Amino acid sequence: MGQQLLRRFKGYGCSMIGACRVVAYAEDVVVILNSPLGCAHILRDRELERNYQATNAMRGMFNSIGRRIVYTNLTNDDCIYGSGKKLAAAIGLVVELYNPAYILVVNSCMVGIIGDDIEAVAAEAEAACKVPVLAINSFGFMNGAYSNGFKLAVSIILSRFCTIQEKQDDTIVIIAPFEGKHSAAFRTVKQYLCFLGMKKVILFPGAASLEEIKLLCTCRYGIIIDHNNMLATDYEAAAEVLHERLGIQILDYADPAGFKETLSWLGKIHTALQSPESSYKMLREQLKQQYSQIINDFLAVAGKGNTVSIVIRDAKVILNFTWLNELLDDLQIEVEGIYIDRDNAMANGNVLDTLLYDVPRLSSIERFYLTVEEISLRLDGKN
């Protein structure tokens, strides 16, 4: 299991979820699910809502109502008479309540079965409301799964809002499944790129505003990051579309793991972007100082030659742990035990498999499957 099988479990869900993912963290769009209540529950309350709420603390929005996702609540009668009237009413209500930059109508398999002309409804509503309305005929599983909806939404959005323009050397797009602009991963990469001379860093698919989407055609370069994510194949497909449609040059390097690989990765980016040598050297020096400070701070607390424990609990994603080899060497410490929360054994077990694959020296370390409370007592020396 773990990292080696990760891509096997890429998005085989409904294509509606894939289409919605393209704008999952965008602030200025409203998604209308033209679907029955069941589809809306899965999409709104379980998938996108969960991901968005996870970022609220970073956004300072602890009481946020979440993403602006509405649904038409299609019924059996709508199977007979069509969904057009409900959808038109929903579009009008969304414009009145939210005043979005644009609206994304994501259609369910029910709409595909009855054959509604959703493009015509969207065009008529757009003319009346003066707001762009894009219809995504994802149709659930009728025309494929998650990946198909994702690619379709990317293609339609680019076709509608992007035209070939003069390239700007200081505008770049990040093509990565980061959890929005407020995620630590995006903020870190953006900081590096701005240091190298980028003035506009766009995260697409996923979080770009309409203004940023229109700027995609000015990007000379795009960077693919996070190849180990289960959505990596979908984002690589999006990169191909960006290259073919807009002529964006895609920089696709192996994800860095650890300090030395990060410096090497930044060197490749620096060379490709032809950024100022002085800026690159200054960034390298700053990162070296930060890493040295981390090492010194840890040794000041733990001391050289001491042992540490690794605790795996409440795992949500499978990570790349190869950086741990470098850190253990630089700290000159040994791992005395690996503690796994047994109440979440399956997910934590997948993470453990990846950890042992990436850091072979840990294969012989004793493992303890305990509750969180038992782990705390053991590490506190109380049991």
Regions found by a protein language model. Give the residues of each.
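An N-terminal assembly and electron-transfer interface module characteristic of large anaerobic redox
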Residues: 1-383
